[in-house]
Amino acid sequence: MNVFARSSVLAAEMIDVFDRTHTEKELVFQSKELCRDFIHSRITREGLSWSKVELDLPEPRGVLVDVSVVLLKLGDELECMRPYVYRNIAKQLNISVSVEAVVSDAFLSVATEVIAMGITWGKVVAIYAVAAGLAVDCVRLGHPVMVHTIVDSLGEFVRRSLVPWLKKRGGWVDILKCVVNMDSRAHVHWLSTAVLTWREFIKTMYVYLTK
């Protein structure tokens, strides 16, 4: 291969890398898509119904599908550890789910407190579990429209607080490392992270209720 051919290949590879660089808009969009899938899974599990289909919003595809599966599996593991923590969120926060601003502010307050001491995948999964638990409450109490408020609030939270962290890890694909080739030490690390997240979540509930 001559120097010009090598230069062309290198240029193409650089363009490819640049194209794979996630923008803020892409990360927020992906985060909201994952949130819709997570919420839809939890609502369906509870025997309720809610359509996550919105105009001009394509279904997740490619690697985002794998990310969604992993996120749900990690959520299952976290919820199994403390099943009552991520249920009846509205009651725990003592809020009415009929007011959009109240639902949004409550979720953002909890999410912000959860990562106050740093961000981990365990905490990110916990935030999704909180969003889903709150969404289930909204549907069960007759306010399914609030599900979209929760999804939008999560998107805003990601934009404010998670985008730089996600970029450093190459995007959502990094979460796949939590379950791929998981050895015993990695499993213990995930569980310890989840327990820490649970403790911080309980503390967050207390902080919110005593404001």
UniProtKB/Swiss-Prot annotation:
Gene Ontology BP terms: apoptotic process; regulation of apoptotic process
Family the entry assigns: Belongs to the Bcl-2 family.
Name of the protein this chain belongs to: Bcl-2-related ovarian killer protein homolog B
Sequence motif: BH1, positions: 113-132
SUPFAM superfamilies documented for this protein: Bcl-2 inhibitors of programmed cell death
Function in brief: May play a role in apoptosis. Does not appear to show pro-apoptotic activity when expressed ectopically in early embryos.
Tissues where this protein is expressed: Expressed strongly in ovary and more weakly in eye. Little expression in other tissues examined.
A GO CC term assigned to this protein in UniProt: mitochondrial outer membrane
Short motif BH3, span: 67-83
Principal location class: membrane
Membrane topology summary: Single-pass membrane protein
Annotated organism of origin: Danio rerio
Record motif BH4, residues: 32-44
Keywords, sorted A to Z: Apoptosis, Membrane, Transmembrane, Transmembrane helix
Motif (BH2) on chain: 165-179
Source superkingdom: Eukaryota
InterPro entries assigned: Bcl-2-like_sf, Bcl-2_BH1-3, Bcl-2_fam, Bcl2-like, Bcl2_BH4
Bilayer-spanning residue ranges: 190-210
GO molecular function: channel activity
SMART domains given in the database record: BCL
Subcellular location: Membrane
